[in-house]
Amino acid sequence: MGFCAALNMDLWSAMSSSINVSPNHSRLIRIAAALLIGPDGRTLLVRKRGTTAFMQPGGKIEPHELPVHALARELEEELGLDIDPAQAVYLGHFSAPAANEPGFVVHAELFQLNIDSDVTPAAEIEEVIWIDPATEGGVVLAPLTRDLILPFYRASLTAIA
């Protein structure tokens, strides 16, 4: 039983919700992100070319695109990972300062996927690492990952233990 089984959400409603980015909100970056969990419980993080911070894989949601479909597209482009969107479990909406765009805020729709396949960095991804969620892996982490997603994952593991 995955840690998300306790979350009883209206998945369709969550996946189809959107944030209106008007000219007054032009400093917002709307993304879909993945908490990719391997068989050993570690989570996959990526680092974009020319940056220092590791973060969840994913990317920007195109206009009129469902977050889960954006996630599937980005995982295929960045990691060669072909996922079934129906297998992605919606975890919620998380916001934090953007790691690579000073002055911007990232609004992330986060999904969990359990994977047991190899990934290959592609597109703008320079490096991938698997880290134990109990640690920070000894690397620089994006604010969203460090302050929200990893603590959320740790708390969920404690809740089901």
Residue ranges of each PLM-predicted region?
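Conserved N-terminal beta-strand and adjoining loop/helix that marks the start
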Residues: S16-T43, K60
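NUDIX/MutT-family hydrolases
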Residues: L110-Q112, T120-R154
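Active-site-adjacent beta-strand/loop module that shapes the phosphate/pyrophosphate-binding cleft
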Residues: F94-T120, P151-F152
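Conserved Nudix-box catalytic region and its N-terminal flanking loop in Nudix hydrolases
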Residues: G38, R42-E78, D82
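A short coil-to-beta-strand element that immediately follows conserved catalytic motifs
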Residues: D82-G92
